[in-house]
Curated annotation (Swiss-Prot):
EC number: 1.14.11.-
Residues annotated to bind 2-oxoglutarate: 171
Name of the featured protein: PKHD-type hydroxylase RPD_3334
Binding residue positions for Fe cation: 98, 100, 161
Provenance organism: Rhodopseudomonas palustris (strain BisB5)
Amino acid sequence: MLVCIPEILSKHEVTEFRRLMDQADWEDGRSTAGAQSAMVKRNEQLPPDSELARMLGRRIVSALTANPKFVSAAVPLQIFPPLFNRYAASGNHHFGIHVDNAVRGDPLTGLRIRTDLSVTLFLAEPDEYDGGELVVEDTYGSHEVKLPAGDCVLYPSSSLHMVTPVTRGARVASFFWLQSMIRDAHARSMIYDLDGAIQALVERLGRDDPETVKLTGIYHNLIRYWADV
């Protein structure tokens, strides 16, 4: 399941993020890559332990957890501290086909998570750069994603994916992973679809409608059955 969510950050917030990031020192992005990923990764990254990266990451997590669509799609248990990368045409930056590590650990906090979902939050407008599409492969084929600044995309961390070479400008983004309460991707997809149907019924019939109440009960009982907390 690939889900795009608009306006996690406002345009004003994106501008503020970019102003701060443009003043920062960047390092080789391979510093946080696994052995296989490091062979195909060419980009720059804010130092994960920098005060700026941590501060901006906290703001992103706060915005995400306040977004109903994100919570519905991810059912998050633990969110890894967001990281920040930059793909510049001047560096021939790209990230070849790879799969994310199954487990990620944060040396600063000791947090360890199973990576169920990967998230990219775009911090550059599509017209600021050429190339730089996120390409995610699944059983239905390849999906290219290039969203407006402030929007994010969620996709299963088990997916093969890549970032195509940037040929003009710079692609700036935040990327991170999360562990969901719902381990199974198919179950998580059904929960998301069911929640969407319930919200549509609430708009049409009201929250107190008997059928809405019944379906809401089914939703929570499925969460109870599947959730790891």
